[in-house]
């Protein structure tokens, strides 16, 4: 395995004290709300990493900290209700690691409870914070900036299939900042002199989406990061194999499950980083003085078995830059 590349850019200064007790006004252990729109089966790795980040700052669940877990069970419509429950319980901090949806829902309900997010979206563009250097009052976290990731994903696909002229982008209607994602993907394709076709799928339209991809004779496909698509991972990978579509995905869970390639943030780091910031806030630092930080690590994974199954030869240059190659 080639060492993963670390690229963190903290965009601000030191934080000052902000005693939790002054806000919580309640006895006992500090309480952290953990909010994700998926289910434990899909986000359990992020939850474990979140606990690890907290432990690195001295907080251990059950010993000197209580964590209230709220899972949307892959129903994004439940997220505002779950956020409202955490706000009603007056938890000390709300964490939404690895998702923007939970952070946005919590922000709409409270301006006093600190909120920590980690997301692949630009937090300024989607309205989570007003500035990376000086985040909004009670909201801060980590971001990996999907615009850069999408451009890189397309570049990797192009290097794998250099003859490709027409690329596809598989999205859902409910992705946060959908219009921006589509525009960025099309701009990245145009910069390479390629075409980008967008295929939008609903929960019951995954099969139809791949039929559409095949009918459009697309040479390769980018699968966007999205809760619905993550929940349908097995189905999507089966269809990609059936149609022999070269595809790149947003995190290594896809490659581990049989996806051809993945490029994106390390999921566990999204949880760990959120845990680190929550721990710092519990120790007294102010959210708005903790700068939004760039995600520290990304990884590029190639599944050679899948590549061979669809009859593609991986250029040595791609193998050389891969962080991991699954044989």
Task: Report each predicted region and the residues it spans.
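Short hydrophobic alpha-helices and adjacent helix-cap/hinge residues
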Residues: 1-327
